[in-house]
């Protein structure tokens, strides 16, 4: 069963803090135009996206796209997808700042058996599915850009390319 969870964002929090106080001669008018009280803002991209429940829902939706895509689905044909989803969630929790450590394999080691068959075409397909998933879940473009920068930072390791 597919869960529907709306990913939340930090944007309303930021807007409330950035509203300018307009100059006024009246204290009442100044109070009326003062910024809304700042509320506690999430401190990580993981929190901005909605935390555990929202990221788990995104991982589920993401892997539904992966297994339906012939470009990349063959890499998961002998994979226990429940375990894979759990690993992906744990990695994203770490990579997006929701967990302080990663206990899994490094990206180069985790993907080494797929190389040389794994290419940039596959990496881009996976990245596109994640971006599409975040878009469908209502994540603002700024947050998608941040999340995709995290994904892009793993490219060299995932594809087992020489380090620069």
Swiss-Prot record:
It holds the Pfam family Bac_globin. Residues 1-22 form a transit peptide. GO terms for cellular component: chloroplast. It is found in: Plastid, Chloroplast. GO terms for molecular function: heme binding; metal ion binding; oxygen binding; oxygen carrier activity. Induction: By light. InterPro entries: Globin-like_sf, Globin/Proto, Globin_bac-like_CS, Hemoglobin_trunc. Binds 1 heme group per subunit. Its main location: plastid. Keywords: Chloroplast, Heme, Iron, Metal-binding, Oxygen transport, Plastid, Transit peptide, Transport. Its cofactor is heme. Gene3D superfamilies: Globins. It comes from the Eukaryota. Heme binds at residues 63, 111. The keyword Transit peptide applies. Monomer. Belongs to the truncated hemoglobin family. Group I subfamily. This is Group 1 truncated hemoglobin LI637.
